[in-house]
Amino acid sequence: SGKTKDRLRTLDTETLLKDYKVENKTAPGTFKYRYSTPLTVPIEGNYTKLPIHPYVLGFILGDGCISGNRPTVRVSTNREDWPEIVDRLRSYLPDPNLVHEGTEVRGAKHFRIHGLGKELKDLGLIGCKSKDKFIPELYLKSSIENRRLLLAGLLDTDGCVGSKKKISKVSTYSSKSEHLRDGISYLVRSLGGLSTKNESTRFKYGRYTTSYMCSIRLAFNPFLRKYK
């Protein structure tokens, strides 16, 4: 569709190919694109009860260690809102005492979450290293509200906010896990957003490592953390 003065138009492919881009006079050698398609509406999901609150699971997948039987999450202590994040995690658990404060290592506070070992094991997540993490199908097909909370938990940890100077803010997510990245991209699209995927391989600490990234553009703010 082409958009002129906030009006949607339906155009055939032949017409689009003729003038879909024009030269950018303010930046020689680059182009501006004349057409765009509107964001879709979110896809309805299932209202099946989830074993772990979606925000908590998102936070664990984003910044947690689940290679052992008890998940550990870390929250940066150089952010003013880290106590608020811990309080939010506690509010989403059946018992706030399940969150135990641990030590502070290199500017990050570590917390151990008790009582979720069985649930994580049933979801196939216990024992997963960073490169093996994934979003369980049950959560990908859950309700719109649950998917939004899951995405918020993921982005509140490893998400990066787009520039505030841009009219259309595009956030990004980076992970060592291709499966987790793919799941996040699916989440964004199922919520009516746009997401593109890419990857980058670098030589670091004596070996090659690959980061899997996706861009995120939504009609709403997907973050819950204030500083984001």
Where are the language model's segments positioned?
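Internal intein/HINT superfamily modules and their associated LAGLIDADG
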Residues: S1-K228
